[in-house]
Amino acid sequence: MDQDACTHSAALILAAGKGTRMCSNKPKVLHTLLGEPLLFHVISALRPLFGSNIWVVIGHGSSLIQSICSDLSLNFIYQEKQLGTANAVSIALPVLQQSRIKRLMVINGDMPLITSDLLECIIKKSDKTDFVFATLKLPLPNDYGRILRREGKIYSIIEAKDIEPSLQHDTTVEVNAGLYYFSLEVVDKCLPMIKNENKSQEYYFTDIIELAVENGYLVDSIYFEEDWHFLGVNTPKDLSYVESIQQAFIIEKLLQSGVIIHSPESVRISPFATIEPGVEIYGPCEIYGASYIASGSIIYSHSWIKNTTISHDVCIYSFCHLDTVIIKDKCSIGPYARLRPGCHLEEQVCIGNFVEIKKTQLGKHVKINHLSYIGDAIVGDESNIGAGTITCNYDGENKHHTFIGKKAFIGSNTALVAPLTIGEKSLIGAGSVIIRDVPENMVSIARGKQKNFSKRK
């Protein structure tokens, strides 16, 4: 889409519904698919085509939706009463007109398998029409609205609840996919004519098709053979099914690109993750968010990774939990390690079993091999942190920082009470509780004097 078209076109996501059949108080569009809300998947498909011209109609759980989407540069429109899809569009219309939008795409917020390429096909189809929408042919139409044609031309859509009994058992019929792109002029004229004279007593946006045809507008459709792109989520079963389709597609694409995946049926990978050819993954494993894994790295089973950048030749052993971390080349993590948000590991860092790290920078060749907690710290190159080392970073009110210089050696079972600085090449004796700064090249021991007593006979 060219810049001018992008400026005067917009997308409207319908996300105000309660999603009653999900049996949850959470807004339906916030239920997650492969670690991300359904709404995020739709936004991801729209963003390359519409930029910041994306409006979301919200109602149930509106404050929660706005909070979770606060960093996404979206425009929100509140629908107080959910009176139907036409009502949602009518509420948005004045805002869109004020923003000088000329063409609008309307899409449901629960269609996570939609793609930018597919949306672009619909936009291109609209060049010679006033209103275009997507259709499918399904052997079991279920809840989909039926397309009615007269002499081959579309003239109406009938929603599933209002279909005559004689048509209920039709085999393989053309249905509405729930995706529209049109001139705002059509909506401005025809939307006020829509009535709620149907079994649901709702204002159906699909009624605009018949009204547009009657008023002389050019209405057309684009048929898609692959119906799975348009699958919506209405129930927990739907969510599970859609997720399985998305996962199978992602796994197949990665396998073809050269990623080695053992037990692929037990591996879950976000569509927003990037994994280079030459990576090896053992299932079960979960990789979410905008994670990036470079070639040569190995991810062993039962690892959970989110929004993490893993460079070349890194080994993540089993049962590791990595959240928003940067890991440079040739590091070794785990097993049973937890790296929390804000960690940055330079090249060839070794993190062993039962180690937790939070908001910490580790220099090159740092070793933390066993049973330690390092939080709010900076550790210099080639330092060694002994087993059982704890940075005592919280005083009950505030967090404090620990600075450990290059080539320092921290003995086992040491408590470092922050704020604290350990100088370069210093050595801390095992079992110490360090409460004051230690200068460079010093040995510091802070523990009780050992006393031996004879055993009683």
Swiss-Prot record:
Residues 1-236 are annotated as: Pyrophosphorylase. Binds 1 Mg(2+) ion per subunit. Gene3D superfamilies: Hexapeptide repeat proteins, Spore Coat Polysaccharide Biosynthesis Protein SpsA, Chain A. Mg(2+) binds at D110, N234. Keywords: Acyltransferase, Cell shape, Cell wall biogenesis/degradation, Cytoplasm, Magnesium, Metal-binding, Multifunctional enzyme, Nucleotidyltransferase, Peptidoglycan synthesis, Repeat, Transferase. GO terms for cellular component: cytoplasm; membrane. Its EC number is 2.7.7.23, 2.3.1.157. UDP-N-acetyl-alpha-D-glucosamine binds at residues 14-17, 28, 79, 84-85, 145, 159, 176, 234, 340, 358, 373, 384. Catalyzes the last two sequential reactions in the de novo biosynthetic pathway for UDP-N-acetylglucosamine (UDP-GlcNAc). The C-terminal domain catalyzes the transfer of acetyl group from acetyl coenzyme A to glucosamine-1-phosphate (GlcN-1-P) to produce N-acetylglucosamine-1-phosphate (GlcNAc-1-P), which is converted into UDP-GlcNAc by the transfer of uridine 5-monophosphate (from uridine 5-triphosphate), a reaction catalyzed by the N-terminal domain. This is Bifunctional protein GlmU. It comes from Lawsonia intracellularis (strain PHE/MN1-00). The gene is glmU.
